[in-house]
Amino acid sequence: YAKYLNQNGWSLDLVSHSEERSKKAREFFQNNNKNNYYHFDLSKKDSILELLDKIDCPDLVVANAGITMMSKAGESSSLQRDELYYLLCGGVIDLIEGLVPRLKEKDASRIVIISSIGAVTPMPKSSLYASAKSGIYSYGRSIGEELANENISVTISLPGYVKTNAHRRAGLDHLERKIPFWMWVSAEKVVKMTEKASIAGKSTVIPGLAYKLVKPFLGMEITSKAWKMLNKRN
């Protein structure tokens, strides 16, 4: 998303927990000297509060936590659950809640929340991830209705399988072999479709033609069984 916005002339406030990724971002965007870079662990409340103190009020907020977690029910630790939930849901809420009073002072502004298709369909062995994404999806839809009269648009994107290295980092590299090619969506397509929907003032968007076609069947038992079969390790 940052690459797309940079190409379109935006000045960016970029936040990353990884020093290596932050360094790569600085090198990639070296021609844009208006960008700001922050190194925070967004799974911690103190980091969100410190970030809110440092940044100016943006015209566009993109909440995109690029992490996933595979965990069978009953096998995660309390710390894992707390950190994942705050990163994917609670921290996003705290960030947006902290910015909304300032956003209301602008003539117009936008909020984009990257949720997941897992927010609206069962994800066996990824229940923590899916439930956190479901929570932020519900929050986004609710504040979207509330803030519409404040000239603040809220768009929630529900991507499916996106071609990034997030699955590998989470130990889910088997998905690259199991999931049919037509179910994968490029990160570039997700960003372009999400940004188009946001500019148009749409509340939700499901990037990718395949996911649009199966949208009426999401949440049904047959869809859940197919999802479980595709995600199963050999």
Regions found by a protein language model. Name each.
Residues 64-69:
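Conserved NAD(P)H cofactor-binding loop of Rossmann-fold oxidoreductase domains
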Residues 72-85:
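Substrate-binding pocket helix/loop in short-chain dehydrogenase/reductase
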Residues 1-12:
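Canonical Rossmann dinucleotide-binding motif of NAD(H)/NADP(H)-dependent dehydrogenases/reductases
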Residues 96, 132:
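Active-site helix of classical SDR
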Residues 156, 177-213:
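C-terminal helical subdomain
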Residues 116:
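Residue(s) in the substrate-gating loop at a strand-loop-helix junction
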Residues 123-127:
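Active-site loop immediately N-terminal to the catalytic Tyr-X3-Lys motif
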